[in-house]
Amino acid sequence: MADQLTEEQVTEFKEAFSLFDKDGDGCITTRELGTVMRSLGQNPTEAELRDMMSEIDRDGNGTVDFPEFLGMMARKMKDTDNEEEIREAFRVFDKDGNGFVSAAELRHVMTRLGEKLSDEEVDEMIRAADTDGDGQVNYEEFVRVLVSK
């Protein structure tokens, strides 16, 4: 996984890691992990940090060495890429940029993709995704549909 990072990314991660490795022993504490990740443009929640630590701190000593950190950051970067792809897909459907996909917008995009859908089929797609019942699909609903596939 870490081999998918560029040399520049590895260098950037090493610099950030070193900033928080106060005593130079090659390890940072779990508390410092969130600070390091935020300095690299990630925004992990407390729950995500706990999950990451339990995943990478195999010996349970409360510290993370650089190879463990690098593997975790590679996974996190991959997740971020996937999220950006989903946001981009949503923007394709959300023609007017109002944060919602209407039946008309869905029909327009599907037609451009070569899918000739009946009004009933488009309405059914909207109904299936529209969990709050407002007649259109917001970003959270859009993600839920994509992730459930």
Swiss-Prot record:
Ca(2+) 3 binds at D94, D96, N98, E105. It comes from the Eukaryota. One of its GO terms (molecular function) is calcium ion binding. InterPro entries: CALM/Myosin/TropC-like, EF-hand-dom_pair, EF_Hand_1_Ca_BS, EF_hand_dom. Keywords: Calcium, Metal-binding, Repeat. Pfam families: EF-hand_7. Ca(2+) 2 binds at D57, D59, N61, T63, E68. The keyword Repeat applies. Induction: By TGFB1. Expressed in normal mammary, prostate, cervical, and epidermal tissues. It is greatly reduced or undetectable in transformed cells. GO terms for cellular component: centrosome; cytoplasm; extracellular exosome; myelin sheath. Ca(2+) 1 binds at D21, D23, D25, C27, E32. Ca(2+) 4 binds at D130, D132, D134, Q136, E141. Residues 8-43, 44-79, 81-116, 117-149 form the EF-hand domain. May function as a specific light chain of unconventional myosin-10 (MYO10), also enhances MYO10 translation, possibly by acting as a chaperone for the emerging MYO10 heavy chain protein. May compete with calmodulin by binding, with different affinities, to cellular substrates. Belongs to the calmodulin family. Binds four calcium ions. Interacts with MYO10, the interaction is calcium-dependent and essential for MYO10 function in filopodial extension. This is Calmodulin-like protein 3. It comes from Homo sapiens (Human). The lineage of its organism: Eukaryota, Metazoa, Chordata, Craniata, Vertebrata. The gene is CALML3.
